[in-house]
Amino acid sequence: MLKIIMPTIMLFPVIWYSNNTMIWINMTSYSLMISLMTLPLLNQTENNSNNFSLTFFSDSLSSPLLMLTVWLLPLMIMASQHHLTKESLMRKKLYLSMLIFLQMFLIMTFTATELILFYILFESTLIPTLIIITRWGNQTERLNAGLYFLFYTLIGSLPLLVALIYVQNSLGSLNYLVMNMWSQDMSGLWSSNLLWLACIMAFMVKMPLYGLHLWLPKAHVEAPIAGSMVLAAVLLKLGGYGMLRLTMILNPTTKIMAYPFIMLCLWGMIMTSSICLRQTDLKSLIAYSSVSHMALVIVAILMQTPWSFMGATALMIAHGLTSSMLFCLANSNYERIHSRTMLLARGLQAFLPLMATWWLLASLTNLALPPFINLIGELFVIMASFSWSNLTIIMTGFNMLITALYSLYMLTMTQRGKFTYHIHNIKPSYTRENTLMSMHMLPLIMLTFNPKIIMGLTY
């Protein structure tokens, strides 16, 4: 584990001691090397868990998420290069330092064995993200977005801390590996329902559950490109990861408590998909589509069947890469026409034909076109929920239809049509941007050929 954490820490001297003209090249190449070092994690052992030490471990759930986190850092650095050109050197270095802090916390969160350590790291990811949003965001509303983000996350996760201390006192240990083997039935306690709610609420806010999702569109719209990418691709997955870990431990109670949440998610996923059809702001549309996809993941996790767990893990990884790519594309539009309004970006296909190809691919992966891993994840979840109740097929089928509609709406609004006359002297698409898009697309295509490596614990 240290061979991933230590090189990540050594990125700090790379930033602060590099030659000023070489910062971007050094950072990108070094972080890409670190991401390639995580590839052996795909080769999971037979008993499904690599225990590196008493503090860190990885299994077939945490290693795909860990790889996604590490893979995203070079992509964030490549995407941020243009909008930091006018910033002073000191601020560039601070921005990159924040990204590395965030990556370090995320790596340790996904591999922590002890629940209190997991909680501390889970909360500390908030600090660099908040600084990135409130310092490098585009408009003054970023402060409001930062406040929403901070208070939703903090208030949601305070009950988790109380619940963890209570469990520590009653069981004597908060180690995942010990608690999975714990035979005592938690549902015998009078407070088991409250305990379940306290444990799960933090992750429901982070996912976010429909109704607790108001911080997400605000944070996404105001964040700079790297903030949006890491928020969509990894920070939302922290919620799913925590839920997958904790629902297994709190198991008998989950069967009773899951009903209202599953209904709310099935309803919320259709509502947020419908909101997407009415959006004019491109980043806001992608943010609401994230809420809709994550609702499907919550449904899958609460179903508690092997199939739904596999679907949830596959969907989390697929959505991480897809939404990150969509935010990059939205940012490349924003850098050229300085507006997030889709109506003003129409007709860009004539100017940037290669970008239009990336838009097409990203939209198709977002609407879960057959060969892609997105469809595999969605189908697993839909089949698991169908076996839970036949009526869910109406909701999930309707959701897939609306997802296809808003993905194609987004594509046609930004690429097709007659271009507006205020668009002039548009820069061509850079090699940097094309590389960035292909580095999002490549893992998606490769996972399509071998999806079993991201199917999680129950494969």
Curated annotation (Swiss-Prot):
<dbReference type="InterPro" id="IPR000260">
    <property type="entry name" value="NADH4_N"/>
</dbReference>
<dbReference type="GO" id="GO:0008137">
    <property type="term" value="F:NADH dehydrogenase (ubiquinone) activity"/>
</dbReference>
<dbReference type="GO" id="GO:0015990">
    <property type="term" value="P:electron transport coupled proton transport"/>
</dbReference>
<keyword id="KW-0520">NAD</keyword>
<dbReference type="InterPro" id="IPR010227">
    <property type="entry name" value="NADH_Q_OxRdtase_chainM/4"/>
</dbReference>
<keyword id="KW-0472">Membrane</keyword>
<dbReference type="InterPro" id="IPR001750">
    <property type="entry name" value="ND/Mrp_TM"/>
</dbReference>
<keyword id="KW-1133">Transmembrane helix</keyword>
<keyword id="KW-1278">Translocase</keyword>
<keyword id="KW-0679">Respiratory chain</keyword>
<dbReference type="GO" id="GO:0032981">
    <property type="term" value="P:mitochondrial respiratory chain complex I assembly"/>
</dbReference>
<feature type="transmembrane region" description="Helical">
    <location>
        <begin position="194"/>
        <end position="214"/>
    </location>
</feature>
<keyword id="KW-0249">Electron transport</keyword>
<feature type="transmembrane region" description="Helical">
    <location>
        <begin position="351"/>
        <end position="373"/>
    </location>
</feature>
<dbReference type="GO" id="GO:0048039">
    <property type="term" value="F:ubiquinone binding"/>
</dbReference>
<feature type="transmembrane region" description="Helical">
    <location>
        <begin position="224"/>
        <end position="244"/>
    </location>
</feature>
<dbReference type="Pfam" id="PF01059">
    <property type="entry name" value="Oxidored_q5_N"/>
</dbReference>
<feature type="transmembrane region" description="Helical">
    <location>
        <begin position="308"/>
        <end position="330"/>
    </location>
</feature>
<comment type="subunit">
    <text>Core subunit of respiratory chain NADH dehydrogenase (Complex I) which is composed of 45 different subunits.</text>
</comment>
<protein>
    <recommendedName>
        <fullName>NADH-ubiquinone oxidoreductase chain 4</fullName>
        <ecNumber>7.1.1.2</ecNumber>
    </recommendedName>
</protein>
<keyword id="KW-0999">Mitochondrion inner membrane</keyword>
<keyword id="KW-0812">Transmembrane</keyword>
<keyword id="KW-0830">Ubiquinone</keyword>
<feature type="transmembrane region" description="Helical">
    <location>
        <begin position="284"/>
        <end position="303"/>
    </location>
</feature>
<feature type="transmembrane region" description="Helical">
    <location>
        <begin position="20"/>
        <end position="42"/>
    </location>
</feature>
<dbReference type="GO" id="GO:0005743">
    <property type="term" value="C:mitochondrial inner membrane"/>
</dbReference>
<keyword id="KW-0813">Transport</keyword>
<feature type="transmembrane region" description="Helical">
    <location>
        <begin position="147"/>
        <end position="167"/>
    </location>
</feature>
<keyword id="KW-0496">Mitochondrion</keyword>
<dbReference type="Pfam" id="PF00361">
    <property type="entry name" value="Proton_antipo_M"/>
</dbReference>
<dbReference type="GO" id="GO:0006120">
    <property type="term" value="P:mitochondrial electron transport, NADH to ubiquinone"/>
</dbReference>
<feature type="transmembrane region" description="Helical">
    <location>
        <begin position="60"/>
        <end position="80"/>
    </location>
</feature>
<feature type="transmembrane region" description="Helical">
    <location>
        <begin position="391"/>
        <end position="411"/>
    </location>
</feature>
<comment type="similarity">
    <text>Belongs to the complex I subunit 4 family.</text>
</comment>
<feature type="transmembrane region" description="Helical">
    <location>
        <begin position="98"/>
        <end position="118"/>
    </location>
</feature>
<comment type="function">
    <text>Core subunit of the mitochondrial membrane respiratory chain NADH dehydrogenase (Complex I) which catalyzes electron transfer from NADH through the respiratory chain, using ubiquinone as an electron acceptor. Essential for the catalytic activity and assembly of complex I.</text>
</comment>
<dbReference type="InterPro" id="IPR003918">
    <property type="entry name" value="NADH_UbQ_OxRdtase"/>
</dbReference>
<feature type="transmembrane region" description="Helical">
    <location>
        <begin position="256"/>
        <end position="276"/>
    </location>
</feature>
